[in-house]
C-alpha cells in the first residue's frame, strides 16, 4: 500500500520472502535481527532469549541481537538502533539524521502497523474505522502521508544511502473460531499455541510435536506448537462465546496464511 508513495521518492526494487513460524514479533523479528532461528538464539545467546511463560518483555534485546550478527560475520560496522512508537520518537530521529548518516547501518523499528492492529482489537471506534482490509490499508496510507516517517524518507532520498524496508510478519482477519484446550501456562496468542497437552480436534490447524525439528525452542520436554491456518483463531471452551464475539473479525498474526507469511522486501 505504501509502494507508490515510496516509489515517488526512490528507485525501488520489490521482492518477497517467507516469514518463519510463528508469525509473531518475538520469533520473526528476533530471527531477522540475529540472522538465526529461534532455537539457535536460545541456545547460542540464552541471555537474549525470553520464553513465552516468562514475564519479561519478549523484544527488549533487539539491538544486542543485531550486534551478535555483525560480530558473527566478523564485521566492524558501526550501527544504531531505534524503536519509533510515536511522532516524538520520529521527530527525534529526524533531528539526528546528520549524525546517523555517519553509521554504516541504522536500524529503525516503526511500530504503527502493529499498534493499529492491537488498537483495532481493543477499541470499538478503531474497529469501526478499519472495519475491513481496504479500510485498514487506507488508514495506514493516510498515517504515512502525514507522518514524520514520510519526512524522514524524503530527507533520505536526497542522500546516497541505501534503504531496506520490510516487516517481520503480516496479519489476517480472523473469522472462524476453533476450540482448543491447554493448561494454564499456555500462551495467549489467538493464532498459535505452545504448551503441554494441547488438544484441538479441528482439521484447520498445523501441529509441530517436535519443536526442534522446526528450530523452535521447547521450554518443556512435552512442549508442542499448534498453528491456526486460513482465517481461523483459537478460543477456549471456557468463556467460548465471549472469546468469539470479542475477537471475531479482528486482525491477528502468529499462524499460517499467505497474508501472515509472505513478506514484502523493498530496497
Regions found by a protein language model. Give the residues of each.
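Feature captures the catalytic ectodomains and active-site-proximal regions of enzymes
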Residues: 1-267
Amino acid at each position: 500500500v505504501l509502494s507508490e508513495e515510496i516509489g515517488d521518492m526512490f528507485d525501488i526494487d520489490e521482492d518477497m520472502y517467507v516469514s518463519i513460524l510463528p508469525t509473531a514479533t518475538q520469533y520473526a523479528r528476533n530471527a531477522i535481527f540475529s540472522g538465526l532461528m529461534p532455537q539457535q538464539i536460545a541456545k547460542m545467546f540464552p541471555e537474549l532469549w525470553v520464553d513465552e511463560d516468562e514475564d519479561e518483555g519478549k523484544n527488549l534485546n533487539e539491538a544486542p541481537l543485531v550486534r551478535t550478527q555483525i560480530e558473527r560475520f566478523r564485521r566492524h560496522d558501526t550501527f544504531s538502533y531505534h524503536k519509533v512508537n510515536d511522532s516524538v520518537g520520529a521527530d527525534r530521529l529526524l533531528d539526528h539524521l546528520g549524525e546517523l548518516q555517519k553509521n554504516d547501518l541504522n536500524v529503525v523499528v516503526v511500530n504503527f502497523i502493529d499498534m493499529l492492529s492491537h488498537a483495532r482489537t481493543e477499541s470499538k471506534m478503531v474497529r469501526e474505522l478499519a472495519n475491513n482490509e481496504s479500510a485498514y490499508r487506507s488508514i495506514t496510507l493516510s498515517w504515512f502521508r502525514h507522518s514524520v516517517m514520510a519526512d524522514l524518507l524524503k530527507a533520505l532520498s536526497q542522500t546516497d544511502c541505501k534503504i531496506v524496508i520490510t516487516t517481520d510478519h503480516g496479519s489476517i482477519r480472523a473469522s472462524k473460531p476453533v476450540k482448543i484446550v491447554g493448561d494454564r501456562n499456555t500462551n495467549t496468542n489467538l493464532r498459535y499455541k505452545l504448551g503441554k497437552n494441547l488438544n484441538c480436534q479441528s482439521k484447520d490447524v498445523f501441529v509441530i510435536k517436535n519443536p526442534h525439528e522446526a528450530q523452535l525452542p521447547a521450554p518443556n520436554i512435552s512442549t508442542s506448537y499448534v498453528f491456526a491456518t486460513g482465517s481461523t483463531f483459537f478460543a477456549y471452551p471456557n468463556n467460548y462465546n465471549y472469546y468469539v464475539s470479542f475477537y471475531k473479525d479482528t486482525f491477528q498474526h502468529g499462524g499460517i496464511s499467505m497474508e501472515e507469511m509472505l513478506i514484502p522486501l523493498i530496497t
